[in-house]
Amino acid sequence: LFGPIAGLVIGLIGHALVDFTAYGPWWSWIIASGVFGLLTGLFLGKLDLESGEFGKKQIILFNVSQLIAHVICWGLVAPVLDIVIYNEPLEKLFAQGLTAGIVNAITTGVVGTVLLVAYAKTRTKKGSLNRE
């Protein structure tokens, strides 16, 4: 809805606030959340939700896109940054990333799809208004 820059900033700030108020910041995962927001913003730009259309094709595109973004962020970005920033053991990282990626992808797939369908229904469909 707002684009890749907003997605990046929202991902960074949202994850950082949760970490700061809970147990302390884990920068590799904060950055991965920002990258997820960036990628999602890029992918969602292709959906054209403002047209009021969010059918089967758009649902599939959204879910394939968010799945790719989760694989990149939690299977690559977070584990690599954990190694670079925190010198974490390799065995643990990819198992952690895989688990987080699967859970996040399922959550995004279910909740995200429901929210996007609901949002699209609030938009006026192209060609639904006639000039008199």
Where are these regions (language model features)?
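Loop-helix junctions at membrane interfaces
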Residues: 1-132
